[in-house]
Amino acid sequence: MSVPGPAAVPVVFDVNVLVLAVAVGESPFRSWPSPPPTSGNPSADCLGVVNDAAEFALWLSPHILAHTGRVLATVLKTPDDEVDDYLRALAEMADASGGGITDPPQTVGDGPDWEDNRILDLAAAVGAFLVVSADADLTGLSPWRGRPIIEPPQFASMAGASRRARRRRR
C-alpha cells in the first residue's frame, strides 16, 4: 500500500496572468518552463509551476477562460485557432494539476471592480490558498479573507525557492 503524497495547494490566477503568459516576450506556450524562473516571463513561469502538477492545483472558471479568450482575440488580435488551443491547454493543465474548472456563485463584492470580484468568487469557492495577479487593485486587497494575493514574480520566486530547498534536503 502506498502513502499518498501531499495534496496540491489550490491557487487561482487572474486573467491578466493567463494573458501575459502568452502575450509578453518569447512565449513558451508549447513547453512551459520548469522550474521557474527560466523564461524571463514571470506569468509563463507561473504556468510552468502549475504544469508540473507537483505543489499547486490551478482552478479556473468558465468566466476566467472566456475573458482570457476575449482579451487575446479582441485586444491582442490572436487568431481564433490559437486562442482555442491555449484555452484547451489551460483547461488540461488545471485538470492535470489537481484543480479544474468550476462555475462559482457570484457572491463577492469586496473589490471595486466587477472582474476582480469574479476572481475572488472562484478563490472563495475552491478554498484557494492564494491568488496570483498583476492587477494593482486586486493585489491591494491582500490579504483578502486571509488569502495572500501576490504578483507573478513573487509566485514564481516562491515556488523556485521551495523546490531548491527540497532538493537540498534530499
Give each language-model segment a name.
Residues 1-58:
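Short, well-structured N-terminal submotif of metal-dependent ribonuclease cores
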Residues 109, 113, 129-130, 136-170:
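Acidic, PIN/NYN-like endoribonuclease modules and their adjacent C-terminal/linker elements
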Residues 91-130:
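Active-site neighborhoods of divalent-metal-dependent phosphate/nucleic-acid chemistry enzymes
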Residues 20-22, 71, 141, 158-159:
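Residues that scaffold the ATP/ADP-binding catalytic core of kinase and kinase-like folds
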Residues 12, 131-132:
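Structural motif
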